[in-house]
């Protein structure tokens, strides 16, 4: 059984939620059948979106430092419950010997398996500007639909003034509003492309499937950890 390493703190609530989902998705009948999980919750990692938009400190030194600590502690592979941090995944991979399983790569595979051609993306402006979703999804022939500039302001408010600030009601209201707009424009599924989105949006909220990368990576992590 392999040990899962979670590079967390981006944000703390999303990190706790990923751990919860790993536990729930593990087909265990007793404690001893669960994989070992090492969580490094490092909320001091600089804001990823601010850096991508040229307004903040480079998060890579802290991301790499945290990944190295997970490796030293015995993690066999690393996952990150932060979509925007995946813009730096190659930099982290080069600095460590253990693999990072990319949440975005795994989500692209899942959407392809489900047969969707147009996916609406709810994510931070940093994630959208970095192009990480377009890059991975284009490999599988899936078009990424993003909100307009004004709609994206609502998404960012929902994430930062809503979920990250502990105001889940505001976060849910703003994110659901934008999800429904993308749905009306022809999105065949909605990607919860920021872990704060998956904290407040649920499948029952939408007519089209809600694809949650946090669910996808939790399932993949459990599968890899339990492989003989």
Swiss-Prot record:
UniProt keyword annotations, A-Z: Disulfide bond, Isomerase
GO MF: aspartate racemase activity
Position of the signal peptide: none
InterPro entries: Asp/Glu/hydantoin_racemase, Asp/Glu_race, Asp/Glu_racemase_AS_1, Asp_race
A Pfam cross-reference name: Asp_Glu_race
Binding site for substrate: 47-49, 83-85, 164
Reaction equations catalysed: L-aspartate = D-aspartate
Keyword Transferase: no
Activity regulation, short description: Weakly inhibited by citrate, but not by asparagine.
Listed EC numbers: 5.1.1.13
Record: active site: 82 (proton donor/acceptor), 194 (proton donor/acceptor)
Assembly description: Homodimer. The existence of the interchain disulfide bond seen in the crystal structures is uncertain, but disulfide bonds have been reported for cytoplasmic proteins from thermophiles.
Family: Belongs to the aspartate/glutamate racemases family.
Annotated protein name in UniProt: Aspartate racemase
Organism lineage: Archaea, Methanobacteriati, Methanobacteriota, Thermococci, Thermococcales
């Amino acid at each position: 059984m392999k040990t899962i390493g979670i590079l967390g703190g981006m944000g703390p609530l999303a990190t706790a939620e990923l751990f919860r989902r790993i536990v729930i998705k593990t087909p265990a009948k007793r404690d001893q059948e669960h994989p070992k999980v090492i969580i490094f919750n490092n909320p001091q990692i600089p804001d990823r979106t601010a850096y991508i938009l040229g307004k903040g400190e480079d998060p890579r030194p802290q991301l790499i430092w945290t990944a190295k600590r997970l490796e030293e502690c015995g993690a066999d592979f690393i996952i990150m419950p932060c979509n925007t941090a995946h813009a730096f995944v190659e930099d982290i991979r080069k600095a460590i010997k253990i693999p990072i399983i990319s949440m975005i790569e795994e989500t692209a595979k899942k959407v392809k398996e489900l047969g969707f051609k147009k996916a609406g993306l709810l994510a931070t402006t940093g994630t959208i500007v970095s192009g990480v979703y377009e890059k991975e999804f284009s490999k599988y022939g899936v078009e990424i639909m993003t909100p307009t500039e004004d709609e994206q302001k609502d998404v960012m408010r929902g994430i930062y003034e809503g979920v990250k600030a502990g105001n889940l009601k505001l976060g849910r209201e703003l994110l659901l509003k934008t999800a429904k707009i993308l749905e009306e424009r022809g999105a065949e599924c909605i990607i919860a492309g920021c872990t704060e989105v998956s904290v407040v949006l649920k499948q029952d909220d939408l007519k089209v499937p809600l694809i949650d990368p946090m669910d996808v990576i939790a399932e993949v992590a459990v599968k890899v950890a339990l492989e003989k």
